[in-house]
Regions:
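Thiamine diphosphate
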Residues: 1-159
Length: 159
């Protein structure tokens, strides 16, 4: 459940940053990660222009001894998109950030929202796989349950 600032849950292991249109996906990803004992928070960003929510992100970042691990979920192009804005904001304020941008970097053929998400690698199981590839220590047992990264392989094979 989101609090008044658009935050959901603890963020010991990382924070998923999303816009309203990707909140359901973020919640699914968080649920899959939670099954393995990882605590990822969700921060919903209300708008990009004007971007007035950096103070909230800075406060999250300052609670971490290490660089803040963030995943951005974006349905638009990666270059110049939501993740780029987040990276620029952190760099501009000299705050450490370890960022994984999950988004589209190619033309997506027509299909249902679910088909397009799978094609673009934005289905929840695919995002979890990207997280585990980016931060392999998560898959190497640094959790109460451990995991097998293969269980998050796409049901359609490599997409």
């Amino acid at each position: 459940r989101l609090d008044g600032a658009g935050l959901c849950g603890g963020h010991r292991d990382g924070t998923i940053l999303c816009l309203g249109n990707t909140l359901v996906t973020a919640q699914s990803v968080r649920g899959l990660l939670r099954e393995h004992g990882w605590e990822w928070g969700i921060a919903v960003i209300g708008r990009l222009k004007p971007f007035d929510q950096f103070t909230r992100l800075r406060d999250i970042a300052l609670t971490h001894a290490e660089p803040l691990r963030c995943v951005t979920l974006e349905e638009g192009m990666l270059s110049g998109g939501f993740g780029s804005l987040i990276a620029e904001q952190f760099a501009g304020h000299a705050l450490p950030l370890d960022l994984l941008r999950c988004g589209v970097d190619a033309f997506v053929p027509a299909g249902s929202k679910e088909e397009c998400a799978v094609w673009a690698g934005l289905a929840p199981h695919q995002i979890v796989q990207q997280i585990l590839q980016r931060w392999p220590w998560l898959a190497q047992g640094d959790s109460p349950k451990g995991t097998d990264i293969g269980q998050y392989a796409s049901p359609l094979g490599d997409v």
